A protein has these predicted regions:
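Canonical Rossmann dinucleotide-binding motif of NAD(H)/NADP(H)-dependent dehydrogenases/reductases
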Residues: 2-33
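Conserved glycine-rich Rossmann-like NAD(P)H-binding loop of the short-chain dehydrogenase/reductase
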Residues: 28-44
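Catalytic Tyr-X3-Lys loop
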Residues: 86, 97-117, 141, 158, ...
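Conserved mid-core segment of classical short-chain dehydrogenase/reductases
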Residues: 87-105, 124, 128-134, 154-157, ...
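Alpha-helical segment proximal to the catalytic Tyr-Lys
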Residues: 124, 173-175
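Residue(s) in the substrate-gating loop at a strand-loop-helix junction
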Residues: 145
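Short, small/polar-rich loop/turn modules that mediate ligand/substrate recognition or access, typified
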Residues: 177, 182, 236-239
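C-terminal substrate-recognition "lid" of short-chain dehydrogenase/reductases
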Residues: 219-243, 248
Length: 252
């Protein structure tokens, strides 16, 4: 799919992978709707991009707020990139007792249910569009994590949510094939995003040293570059791509 002149929704656009993706797509000529609950971050991204971007304050778990964003995308809407998500560190049984059910449910609600909410509403709008080359109507890119496969201590909730995102990729791609809509997922490894920003520098260096090559944290721009490749290559469909420098997390 040609990106130039199309409109894309990017969730979690206020920082990290979402911000880099919004910048990448706008640079390729797209209009970007920057969705986030972080008003300052979302407005900052849209402002940095300029005329090709608009900030939309939207909670991915809200049907009405996402539906309004989809409506704002108009007839040029060509897809979405799901980057919104949260992470927690909580053991199944810790010093204070069992994992809090509320915190587990919150991670699932935002990371998995929120992603699906965006997928279904965007896909419903795209299905009404006139098809382009090869009958394509749009593309949706999701964000999982290598934690979906190599989850660490304290990552039960996060791994479950990202494992769900990885698992829904193929069935949704099959569901939407008749409409000419592709569904892909990227599973990033260790990236230099706000989720890791709070760690002490020695801890960040230790994490980077675990990556076989390149032995560093990923740059969000590298994630965004893969998003662009996925959008532009119609044969990429129904797959989860690990973007991790060959990292396989050891139990810790």
């Amino acid at each position: 799919m040609d990106i130039d002149g199309r409109t894309f929704i990017v969730t979690g656009a206020g920082s990290g992978l979402g911000r880099a993706t919004a910048v990448e797509l706008a640079g390729a000529g797209a209009r970007v709707l920057c969705l986030d609950v972080d008003v300052a971050g979302g407005e900052g991204t849209a402002g940095a991009i300029g005329g090709n971007a608009d900030f939309v304050r939207a909670d991915v778990t809200s049907e009405s707020e996402v539906a309004a964003a989809v409506e704002q995308g108009g007839k040029a809407l060509a897809g979405a990139v799901n980057c919104a998500g949260i992470g927690i560190a909580e053991r199944t049984v810790g010093r204070d007792g069992p994992h809090a059910l509320d915190s587990f449910a919150r991670v699932i609600q935002i990371n998995l249910v929120g992603t699906f909410n965006v997928i279904r509403l965007v896909a419903a709008a795209l299905a009404k569009r006139a098809p382009g080359a090869d009958g394509e109507r749009g593309v949706i890119v999701n964000t999982a994590s290598i934690a979906a496969f190599d989850g660490q201590v304290g990552q039960a909730a996060y791994s479950a949510s990202k494992g769900g995102v990885a698992a829904l990729t193929l069935p949704i791609a099959r569901d939407l094939a008749r409409h000419g809509i592709r569904c892909m997922t990227i599973a990033p490894g260790l990236f230099d995003t706000p989720m890791l920003a709070g760690l002490p520098e020695p801890a960040r260096e230790a994490l980077a040293a675990d990556v076989p090559f390149p032995a560093r944290l990923g740059n969000p721009a590298e994630y965004a570059s893969l998003v662009r490749t996925i959008i532009e290559n119609r044969m990429l469909n129904g797959e989860v791509i690990r973007l991790d420098g060959a990292l396989r997390m050891r139990p810790k």
